[in-house]
Amino acid sequence: MLQNSELLQEYLPIAIFFGIALLVSGLIMILPNLLSTKKYNKDKLEPYECGFEPFSDARSKFDIRFYLVAILFIIFDLEIAFLVPWAISLNMIGKIGFFSMIFFLFVLTIGFIYEWKKGALDW
């Protein structure tokens, strides 16, 4: 079993690495704020909207359906992220991997049908 001094000696390079990483990342975040010139004007503080004047305030409320569509997009985007490696390694993972992905797709399909029946996709 290692004694305390030997244990500290083995972890010293890792501690030094984390210390330097924290120092460098802190400097990268702080130095631009200290060294940059700050010129505030009305045009720089306005939101950009395709070259036109903004029609309304950028911080207006959105309909909840936009959030539901965004969440559904993320869920099905992650489904593709799981399907591609699964399809590539299908011959190596065997029947267990095949049926586990079929179960995963079944659960996602049930969730999609539920969202559809609840009217989350109706506008």
Curated annotation (Swiss-Prot):
Keywords associated with the record: Cell inner membrane, Cell membrane, Membrane, NAD, Quinone, Translocase, Transmembrane, Transmembrane helix, Transport, Ubiquinone
Q: Listed GO cellular component terms?
A: NADH dehydrogenase complex; plasma membrane
Molecular function GO terms recorded = NADH dehydrogenase (ubiquinone) activity; NADH:ubiquinone reductase (non-electrogenic) activity; quinone binding
To which species is this protein native? Answer: Rickettsia felis (strain ATCC VR-1525 / URRWXCal2)
* The name this protein goes by in its record: NADH-quinone oxidoreductase subunit A
Gene symbol of the encoding locus: nuoA
Q: Name one Pfam family in it.
A: Oxidored_q4
Q: Which residues cross the membrane?
A: 11-31, 68-88, 93-113
* Lineage, top ranks: Bacteria, Pseudomonadati, Pseudomonadota, Alphaproteobacteria, Rickettsiales
Could you give the subunit structure recorded for this chain? NDH-1 is composed of 14 different subunits. Subunits NuoA, H, J, K, L, M, N constitute the membrane sector of the complex.
